[in-house]
Structure formats: structure tokens, C-alpha cells
Amino acid sequence: MQDSSFRIVDLSVESAKAKSYDNHPIATVNDHEVRISTMTEAYHWHCHPDSDESFLALEGGLFIDFDDRTVQLLPGQMITVNRGVRHRTRPIEG
């Protein structure tokens, strides 16, 4: 029986739900949404004017393109993109 004051999220189960590109919420922390994404293609260029965005690579890894450089994020690594910074994400394979 699970206590209603918490919810255990199994990230491997959540990521297995996706057969192609997928991005869906798995939790809410205060006023922030935690999402899990399976990337099979590049996401479009964009920025977030009012909030930072953090990425945590679980498996496979990803590239994060900025206007002046590209960063490679490997499994177990995390990065926070500051608000207002234009970026796009794309999988390492693809």
C-alpha cells in the first residue's frame, strides 16, 4: 500500500512508454513540473523568458545547441540553461 503523501516514480517504466519522441510530466514540485523526455529528433530553437530549464541525461545522452556553441550531455550529467538563453536539444544518435 502506498502512502498518499508521496508517489514513487520509476523512470525506466516512464521512459519505456515512449516509442518515438515523447515529453510528458511525471511529477509536480511546488509550482514546477518535472518531465521525462525520450528524444528521437531535434527539438526546435526556443527560449524561456521567465524560467530556467534543467536537463538530466539518464541514458544515451543529448546535445544542447546554443547560438555560440554546442554542449554534449552524457548519462549522469545535468545542466541548467538560464532563462532567456536560446537553445535547442537533440539526441546524440539521430
Annotated model-derived regions:
Residues 1-35:
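A short, N-terminal "cap"/entry segment at the start of jelly-roll beta-barrel domains
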Residues 68-83:
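Short acidic-glycine-tyrosine-enriched beta hairpin
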